[in-house]
Each structure stands twice: as structure tokens, then as C-alpha cells.
């Protein structure tokens, strides 16, 4: 299909483009940089609305912990601006486009529309929790704003949150206001070796229930740990369980000491190696995310911590790879993201392994399972989910994503509600039609 691209340079031009599409009955594929084009179902549209021309930071009030930018602003620009003030996006968005140093990669609009969050979600919340305000154009051709530009403002509070994770099916976003937070001064990661999945998830639960403010809790089975670019993890010779602590330097040191004794940890990674291994977890590098790039320099000894000054944070390598793309290659396994009650994670994986050969690792204390699986696995994977769990097909060829429920199938009442919401914003179905569910 030949696609005609419309590239507005102002919000008014974006509104005009949507109004034209509405009057002509032409569906639009909403794009920024295109880094998340492989997420969700392929959009069947003859026209693309490229919002990358709406770029630039509108306002950055670091003292108020608020940043407003146009939707097409590259995340690399935002990352660098925040870093200059010692701030960041606390929900730790994954870099899915191969930019290992990008806070989510791509553009701000794509980041919020996809709603993805990284390991720190367990303590800092999701992308939705950090979205304060939006401006955009609905499928009715109406330009509107929702939310506010201060952290305590609750006017229109639900509208911005509705857009986070909507994958451009409700509104073509033109401007977004997000909450930013101080980046942690220091970070350290406790390592525990040789635990099976169930024991590891139980230990992570203990760590998260402790008073020590754990900000990352992941488990890497032996095959995954061996492929880490951090020598202290790859050299463990088996499974590795990770517990991260962040904050002011003295506080981190004190909490690590207490946690190490309580959990009987085998080793501690210093700041440099902690940043490296959590990038790997965040970006699912072992499953075709950003290439790990080999053992990390200055690894700590396996029996203890390392020199926290051995590697300055700005000298960390930025691993570069193909991201979560490459899904159209026939030899690429399908990538799934399973959200489950943490205690149910290992049993869910065990049930799936009765019929499928899969590879996994756990994040969010066991509540997030990253899984590489062979083709035609959807029925087995979703059949093993416990009540309340859901599975998203993150990477697969276009033809598979067009024929498979990429997101967890919704029960009848929830699907009816989703249709009413879609009809309220986009009654003619011109914005990213079918991106999340067929016919929606």
C-alpha cells in the first residue's frame, strides 16, 4: 500500500489534517519517529500523520518538577535537558528503538501514547502517573486541552491519563506536560546467586516489603544472566536475582548494608555496573532489545562491591542495537510481555513450558514476565494466565500481528466500554484504526 505522509509543523496544521481526513473518510496512521510502529496491530491507512515536525520544549520548570514539550520532541533532547538539572523521568521508560541511552527513545508523544514503563514502575509508578496535561486533536477534528502544568493540579486529571497507553487511537497528541523528578545521586544492586524462579520471587517480595525503599526487583534465570554485559552478573555461573537501592549516597550505603545482611546477598554492584545491568533489564536486551555490547568495564568482584568511583556515570557506554524491531524476520522468535500477580509468575511460566519451549526473565518483583516464544503461541500463553493476568505480543511479523490479538482480549463489558470511549473521541474511526483491537 502506498502511504501519503502529512507532516504538520504546528498544532493548527495538525488539526486541519485531522479535519480533512474526517471529511474525506480517510483513516490516519499517527506517527512520531516511528520507533513504536511495530507495537500493536498494523494500521491499515493510506495516509500517515507525521507529528515529528511538532518539536521543541515549550516550558521546563525544574523547581516545579514539570516539563511541557511538543509531542514530536525527541526523547534524546528531553533526556539531555533533564540530565543538566539532575532530573529524569522516574518511570524509567524502555529504549525500544536501539538507543541504549535514550529515556524511552523516539518522541515524547510516542512514549506517552505507548504507556510503557521500566523497572522503577514498582516504586515510581507508570507513564500514566507522570502525565499531567495534554493537548491534541480528537477524531472529531476538535483541538482541546486536558490537565494542567503543575504537579498538584487535578483539573481534567483523568483526560491525560486516558491518553497514556491509548496508542494514538483516541487523539493525535500535539503537546504533553509530564512530571519530572530528581535523579538518584547513587545506586547499588544486591546480587543473589543460584535461586530458582519461585524462591527468587519470594525473596523479591521480602525485599519489596522491607522498609529499605527498593526501586528495582528482577530475576535472571541462568541462561539470561550468562548473556549479561556486566561481568559480575555473567560470571555468576547460574541464575542471578537483582535488588536495587537508589537515593543519596549515605542512605544507599546504609540500606544496602542492612539488606545484604537480611537477604544474605552474595555480592553488590556499584553505581556504574548497576546502571548497566538495569539498562539491560529495562530494554530486554537479551530478547532483541538494545545489544548489550560485551562485558561491562570495571566489574566488581563476585564476592563484594566495586569501586563506585571506577566509572563516571557520563562515561557509561550507550549500547546500540536494533531495538525491539526485526519482527518481520521469519527467524525471530516472538516476544511477549506478561503482567501477572507476582506470586503467580513462576507457576504461569511452568504451565507454559509444559507445551512450549520459552525463555524468560522476571521484573517488577515477578509481576512482569518477559518471554521469547515460538510462533503460534498465543493460545497456550493466554490459557496459562491466572485471573487478572494479561499478555501483550510485543514483537512478531506484521502478518502475525494483524491476525493475532496483540493485547489481552477484553471481556464483553470492557470491550463495550472501550467502544464507547473510542466513539466519544473518534466516532468515524479515523485515528490509528485497529491498532489495539480489530474493528476499534
Features from the language model and the residues they span:
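Glycine-biased, low-complexity coil/linker segments
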Residues: 303-305, 321-325
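Intrinsic-disorder-associated, low-complexity terminal segments enriched in Asp/Asn/His/Tyr and depleted
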Residues: 296-298, 307, 314, 328
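N-terminal glycine-rich flavin-associated loop
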Residues: 1-28, 51-102, 112, 116-149, ...
Amino acid at each position: 500500500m502506498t502511504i501519503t505522509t502529512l507532516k504538520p509543523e504546528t498544532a493548527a496544521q495538525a488539526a486541519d489534517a485531522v479535519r480533512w481526513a474526517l471529511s474525506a473518510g480517510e483513516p490516519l496512521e499517527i506517527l512520531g519517529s516511528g520507533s513504536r510502529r511495530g507495537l500493536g496491530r498494523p494500521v491499515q491507512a493510506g495516509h500517515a500523520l507525521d507529528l515529528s515536525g511538532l518539536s521543541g520544549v515549550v516550558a521546563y520548570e525544574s523547581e516545579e518538577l514539570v516539563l511541557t514539550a511538543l509531542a514530536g520532541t525527541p526523547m534524546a533532547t528531553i533526556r539531555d535537558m533533564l540530565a543538566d538539572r539532575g532530573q529524569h523521568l522516574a518511570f524509567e521508560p524502555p529504549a525500544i528503538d536501539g538507543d541504549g541511552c535514550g529515556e524511552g527513545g523516539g518522541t515524547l508523544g510516542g512514549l506517552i501514547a505507548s504507556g510503557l514503563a521500566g523497572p522503577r514502575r514498582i516504586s515510581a509508578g507508570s507513564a500514566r502517573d507522570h502525565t499531567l496535561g495534554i493537548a491534541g486533536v480528537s477524531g472529531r477534528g476538535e483541538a482541546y486541552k486536558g490537565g494542567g502544568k503543575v504537579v498538584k493540579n487535578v483539573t481534567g486529571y483523568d483526560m491525560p491519563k486516558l491518553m497514556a497507553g491509548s496508542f494514538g487511537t483516541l487523539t493525535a497528541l500535539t503537546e504533553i506536560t509530564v512530571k519530572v523528578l530528581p535523579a538518584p545521586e547513587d545506586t547499588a544492586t544486591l546480587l543473589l546467586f543460584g535461586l530458582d524462579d519461585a524462591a527468587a520471587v519470594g525473596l523479591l517480595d521480602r525485599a519489596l516489603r522491607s522498609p529499605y525503599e527498593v526501586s528495582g526487583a528482577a530475576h535472571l534465570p541462568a541462561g539470561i544472566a550468562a548473556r549479561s554485559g556486566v561481568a559480575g552478573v555473567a560470571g555468576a555461573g547460574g541464575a542471578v536475582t537483582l535488588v536495587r537501592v537508589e537515593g543519596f549516597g549515605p542512605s544507599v550505603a546504609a540500606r544496602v548494608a542492612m539488606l545484604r545482611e537480611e537477604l544474605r546477598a552474595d555480592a553488590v554492584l556499584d553505581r556504574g555496573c548497576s546502571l548497566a545491568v538495569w539498562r539491560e533489564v529495562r530494554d530486554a536486551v537479551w530478547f532483541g532489545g538494545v545489544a548489550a555490547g560485551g562485558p561491562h568495564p570495571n566489574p566488581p568482584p563476585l564476592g563484594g562491591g566495586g569501586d563506585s568511583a571506577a566509572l563516571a556515570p557520563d562515561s557509561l557506554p550507550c549500547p546500540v542495537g536494533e531495538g525491539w524491531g526485526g519482527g518481520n524476520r521469519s527467524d525471530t522468535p516472538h516476544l511477549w510481555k506478561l503482567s501477572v500477580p507476582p506470586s503467580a509468575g513462576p507457576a504461569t511460566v511452568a504451565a507454559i513450558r509444559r507445551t512450549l519451549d520459552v525463555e524468560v526473565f522476571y521484573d517488577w518483583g515477578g509481576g512482569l514476565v518477559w518471554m521469547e516464544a515460538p510462533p503460534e503461541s498465543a493460545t497456550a500463553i493466554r490459557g496459562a494466565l491466572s485471573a487478572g493476568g494479561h499478555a501483550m505480543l510485543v514483537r512478531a511479523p506484521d502478518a502475525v500481528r494483524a491476525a493475532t490479538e496483540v493485547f489481552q482480549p477484553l471481556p464483553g463489558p470492557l470491550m463495550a466500554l472501550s467502544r464507547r470511549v473510542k466513539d466519544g473521541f473518534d466516532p468515524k474511526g479515523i485515528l490509528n484504526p485497529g491498532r489495539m483491537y480489530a474493528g476499534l
